[in-house]
């Protein structure tokens, strides 16, 4: 099993030194879903949610979340992101919404945490905008689907 990089020899948490790493293109894709009542799904699909355009606001929130990851996750490096692509898919059979985010940078460390944070913030925004009609919504299956770049190379979920 690989060693945990965020702990020093004494077991103390620290921010990993990435200064000696080469800058490479880094890409990560993450995805998650929010399940809801059919009536809530219909409000989103039909654009009738009282708070407005649920998907449009959630998309902006996801982008903002990716940019603020280092403020939320203590040992994450602040990164200059070069691209954040957010896709929402309405799924009537769930019923619910899937959120997929691709984050890119040219840097010394990966962007998995930024992609995961973006997905969570996007889905939390859907919850916030619809909680008045459906407090039982469930955010589920949030995970990294793939990552590219860096010393460890490419990885795709099985």
Swiss-Prot record:
EC number assigned by the record: 4.6.1.17
Catalytic site positions: 128
Annotated S-S bridges: none
Catalyzed chemical reaction(s): (8S)-3',8-cyclo-7,8-dihydroguanosine 5'-triphosphate = cyclic pyranopterin phosphate + diphosphate
EC main group: lyase
Biochemical pathway: Cofactor biosynthesis; molybdopterin biosynthesis
InterPro entries to which the protein is assigned, alphabetical: MoaC, MoaC_bact/euk, MoaC_sf, MoCo_biosynth_MoaA/MoaC, Mopterin_CF_biosynth-C_dom
Family assignment from sequence similarity: Belongs to the MoaC family.
Record's protein name: Cyclic pyranopterin monophosphate synthase
Encoding gene, per UniProt annotation: moaC
């Amino acid at each position: 099993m690989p060693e945990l990089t965020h702990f020093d020899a004494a077991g103390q948490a620290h921010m990993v030194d990435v200064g000696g790493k080469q800058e490479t293109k880094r890409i990560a894709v993450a995805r998650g879903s929010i399940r809801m009542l059919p009536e809530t799904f219909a409000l989103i699909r039909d654009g009738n949610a009282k708070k407005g355009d649920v998907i449009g606001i959630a998309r902006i929130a996801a982008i903002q979340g990716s940019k603020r990851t280092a403020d939320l996750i203590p040992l994450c490096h602040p990164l200059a992101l070069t691209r954040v692509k957010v896709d929402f898919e309405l799924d009537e059979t769930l019923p619910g919404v899937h959120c997929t985010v691709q984050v890119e940078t040219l840097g010394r460390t990966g962007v998995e945490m930024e992609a995961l944070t973006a997905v969570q913030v996007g889905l939390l925004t859907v919850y916030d905008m619809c909680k008045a009609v459906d407090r039982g919504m469930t955010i589920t299956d949030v995970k990294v689907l793939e990552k590219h770049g860096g010393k460890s190379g490419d990885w795709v979920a099985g």
